[in-house]
């Protein structure tokens, strides 16, 4: 009965499901984040990162970025909700780690670009590093994931390329290579129509 967007948790014994509600209630509700914004849709786009010590963190948000530790059961918060101050944050936070660096990428402004920040700690402070990916074709939104596979890094995102005559909220999944500079910063993504081989 709480108005606004919420974040729930579903579980399954298999990656393809079936999934069931793990709690019987939302993990995050809009009334838990009203001190930062009065909008009702700020509690969206969750991502979970499990650090090297096994501690899990939930990051999420729209117009405001938040994180909280998760208990080992992964269905309860373990401490307060913390606000993360990022320039021009819109939504879709994603956390990954490479070496000693943590990377927090996110959708910025509208139409959305992907920006990122770096830190030596999963809890910050975060240093803004700029744009990672420009506006994707025929898509006002642009969300991302960054993964390592067999020693190479990949940038997964979406555009509206499959149906360019449709609306700007249609999403086509894309994947391109991601490269790092010697100082650990990420090189801007070169969006391709071919993807990866």
Predicted regions and their residues:
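Carbohydrate-active catalytic/glycan-binding domains of CAZyme proteins
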Residues: 1-197
């Amino acid at each position: 009965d709480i108005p606004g967007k919420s974040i729930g948790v579903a579980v399954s014994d298999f990656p393809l499901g079936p999934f069931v509600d793990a709690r019987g209630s939302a993990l995050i509700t809009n009334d838990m984040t009203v001190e930062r914004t009065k909008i009702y849709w700020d509690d969206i786009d969750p991502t979970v990162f499990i650090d090297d010590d096994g501690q899990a963190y939930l990051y999420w948000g729209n117009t405001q970025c938040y994180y909280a530790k998760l208990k080992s059961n992964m269905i309860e918060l373990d401490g307060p909700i913390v606000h993360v101050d990022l320039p021009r944050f819109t939504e879709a936070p994603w956390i990954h780690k490479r070496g000693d660096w943590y990377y927090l990428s996110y959708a910025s402004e509208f139409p959305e670009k992907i920006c990122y920040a770096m830190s030596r700690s999963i809890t910050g402070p975060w240093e803004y590093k700029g744009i990672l990916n420009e506006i994707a074709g025929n898509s006002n939104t642009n969300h991302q994931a960054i993964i390592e596979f067999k020693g190479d890094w990949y940038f997964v995102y979406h555009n509206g390329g499959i149906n360019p005559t449709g609306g700007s909220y249609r999403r086509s999944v894309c994947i391109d290579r991601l490269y790092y500079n010697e100082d650990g910063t990420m090189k801007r993504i070169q969006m391709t129509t071919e993807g990866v081989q």
